[in-house]
Amino acid sequence: MNVQPRNMNVQPRNMNVQPVRHKLFFSDTDEEEEDGHSTGEDSAFQESDSPVSRQREKQEGKPPGGTWEELEEEEGFGSSPIKSPGDFFMSDSPSYRQLAPASPTRSPQGPTSPIPECPGTPPHKTFRKLRLFDTPHTPKSLLSKARGIGSSALRFRGGTLFREAEKAPKPEFVYSTPQVNINPFTPDSLEIQSSAGLCRGRKRALLNDSCGEDMEGSDCELEDEDIRPAKRIPITESNMKSRYATEFHELEKIGSGEFGSVFKCVKRLDGCIYAIKRSKKPLAGSVDEQNALREVYAHAVLGQHPHVVRYYSAWAEDDHMLIQNEYCNGGSLSDVISENYRTMQYFTEPELKDLLLQVARGLKYIHSMSLVHMDIKPSNIFISRTTLPNTAVEEADDEECGSGKVIYKIGDLGHVTRVSSPQVEEGDSRFLANEVLQENYTHLAKADIFALALTVWSAAGAEPFPTNGDQWHEIRQGKLPRVPQLLSQEFVDLIKLMISPDPEKRPSSVALVKHSVLLSASRKSAEQLRIELDAEKFKNALLQKELKKAQIAKAAAEERAHFPDRIATRSTTQNNRTTRLIGKKMNRSVSLTIY
């Protein structure tokens, strides 16, 4: 393709200098390469750090990257416009006659151009849209472009600079996609994943139909980044300062488990006490990383409930996961059971019913979110000895928000999974239901009921449960071990029903919170409490009426008692007056008033 050069007359600012003809040559792009001809290295632009440009700069006596004026004014790619020769020769650069032969000419080493080169700045999308390097299409160029797109190799126009930019790593601030975790326990996670699949399908169709269209390489990259699914952020070392040391003051270590250790800390800002769980070993890339993230996901979805340990925040430091939770001043149920076993003092039946009812309410809330805990046991039940206000959280009609002295809360949500798409991580085998061991995940909520029954039975004084063996199988067959206290038969029957070998026969968490055994003695339903309250209010209203009547009668009696004394006092005063001080010559008026 032949392009006729066009002469451009430039009038210099110095009137003593003769005008010069500045020739512009256009080189072929890589789209019109002939077999055995140029490979596109002689394009309009060249990388400043390439060996060819460095050699040319040394021969011409230029500093790397262009003239000294260009280096002073350079602020980004395309920020310095193409200057006329007169603009170059008005500065402190060499004279016009010395640099006149250096105007752009066709040389074996490639063309030179006064356009400043800036290797550190990536080509901008808006700069490409100017199409400064496009040439009229020929049938051969269109066919070659169609073949390039069909082979999924989108080629850049513009020569070496853009091909090198394609190979170079893309800056994070240009096409970076926000990396966020997708919470698997939220309903939106399914919509996000499905929408990502639809976007990928649309992109494939777009690439197949784009052979005859003029597509920009940068646009394709940007679209690919937009529809790419979000990547999971691993637990890696943070660049920030230690948040644990900056925001919290550690008081003591209050527990240790398989995951890590729990510390009692005071937040420096608000002065409140929190429980911060820190993993024992780095979790990045380990098996426990998924469990740690699952616990954070579950806490974030569940929010606040009086019978679930409250979650505040979580972060990673030095590849360790830290979770800030509510501090329960009563410790765990496992600690209380161990102390009771040592002192031979066990939970009474009313206390066992209270424990069962409160934990069942927590499970009801978790199950209502289509989640299951899968690791209910005494060490994951925490005790708070503070009284909850009656306006804390709205419960069901038959549930009481809590006015007792002890509040039981469910914690350690590392094994929580979704009912619809379970990813079961087996918990403690001592409290594990048999169907879960057999990988039957159709009744996962009933597995939590099974574990709750054994937890309550352990608080009643039962021996530590086995991890396997004949006794383990006997319990899965519905046989409870003996306890060192006498319990009512109806309560024992409820516990046996909760560990039934058939998961369908076990009561649900909703049925447990309404069970008559749990609401008979120590607990009353909200409806019963309302009836009793209305009766007391009616009695109180009657008593107030009687009190008002008594007060009125007493006031009337006192008034009648003082009435004769006032009459006698007035008559005596009138008799003692024989003369009048004023109006002696006037007749006294007669009044019929008693006073």
Curated annotation (Swiss-Prot):
Q: Where does ATP bind?
A: I254, G255, S256, G257, E258, F259, G260, S261, V262, K277
The answer, when asked if Acetylation is one of the entry's keywords, is: no
- Major site of localization recorded for this protein: nucleus
**What's its catalytic activity?**
L-tyrosyl-[protein] + ATP = O-phospho-L-tyrosyl-[protein] + ADP + H(+)
What PROSITE patterns does this protein map onto?
A: PROTEIN_KINASE_ATP (PS00107), PROTEIN_KINASE_DOM (PS50011), PROTEIN_KINASE_ST (PS00108)
Q: Does the keyword Cell cycle apply?
A: yes
Positions binding Mg(2+) in this chain are N380, D412
Map out region (Disordered) in residue numbers. 1-127
Q: Which residues cross the membrane?
A: none
Amino acid composition bias (Pro residues), ranges on this chain = 111-122
Compositional bias (Polar residues): 1-17
Please provide the record's keywords in A-Z order: ATP-binding, Cell cycle, Cell division, Coiled coil, Kinase, Magnesium, Metal-binding, Mitosis, Nucleotide-binding, Nucleus, Phosphoprotein, Transferase, Tyrosine-protein kinase
Where along the chain is the active site annotated? D375 (proton acceptor)
Fill in the PTM field for this protein: Phosphorylation at Thr-186 during M-phase by cdk1 inhibits the kinase activity and leads to interaction with pin1.
One of its GO biological process terms is: negative regulation of G2/M transition of mitotic cell cycle
Q: What is one cellular component GO term in this UniProt entry?
A: nucleus
Q: What Enzyme Commission number does this protein have?
A: 2.7.10.2
What is said about its interaction partners and assembly? Interacts (when phosphorylated at Thr-186) with pin1.
Q: What is this protein called?
A: Wee1-like protein kinase 1-B
Gene name, per UniProt, is wee1-b
